[in-house]
Amino acid sequence: MTKQPEDWLDDVPGDDIEDEDDEIIWVSKSEIKRDAEELKRLGAEIVDLGKNALYKIPLDADLRPAIELAQRIKMEGRRRQLQLIGKMLRQRDVEPIRQALDKLKNRHNQQVVLFHKLENLRDRLIDQGDDAIAEVLNLWPDADRQQLRTLIRNAKKEKEGNKPPKSARQIFQYLRELAENEG
């Protein structure tokens, strides 16, 4: 006859007094596997980062070399190294690592949003001309009106002549410089 979990608790001698702090939390095997798989995905996400972004993540002395090694390894060895990184992450507090990753992703998302706004502004500058230039000057008073007009005029000529949009790219770069100098 095999004992069930309830029977195990009854056989403990001197356990007549119940203590609320000694409560046992049962965790299913599949939940443990899900947590391990999630940490392995977190490790893979860290491994996929570039070197500059990797140094912004708080990693200890054992984990950083394992991640740098995984970045150099290919194929099957990489999979095994990712499993090792997942195992190492299970023994650590991963919350600071997750927060740093979220911060990096958020910064990237903010840049994407800014680039979309600048692209829309560039398109309005090419289509509307002086009205959009006034908007740019309201946003960035130190913008050079003459340079913008020249770039817009050249961009319109390139667009009409079906030439590569060199001036449109220059407008975007100029707007990006203005936005970066502001912030």
Swiss-Prot record:
Recorded superkingdom: Bacteria
Entry's Gene Ontology BP terms: assembly of large subunit precursor of preribosome
Subcellular location: Cytoplasm
Cross-referenced InterPro entries: DarP, DarP_sf
Pfam entry (one): DarP
Keywords associated with the record: Cytoplasm, Ribosome biogenesis, RNA-binding, rRNA-binding
GO CC annotation terms, alphabetical: cytosol
CDD domains: YjgA-like
Gene Ontology MF annotations: ribosome binding; rRNA binding
Family membership: Belongs to the DarP family.
NCBIfam families in the cross-refs: PRK05255.1-1 (NF003593)
Function recorded in the entry: Member of a network of 50S ribosomal subunit biogenesis factors which assembles along the 30S-50S interface, preventing incorrect 23S rRNA structures from forming. Promotes peptidyl transferase center (PTC) maturation.
The name this protein goes by in its record: Dual-action ribosomal maturation protein DarP
Native organism: Shigella flexneri
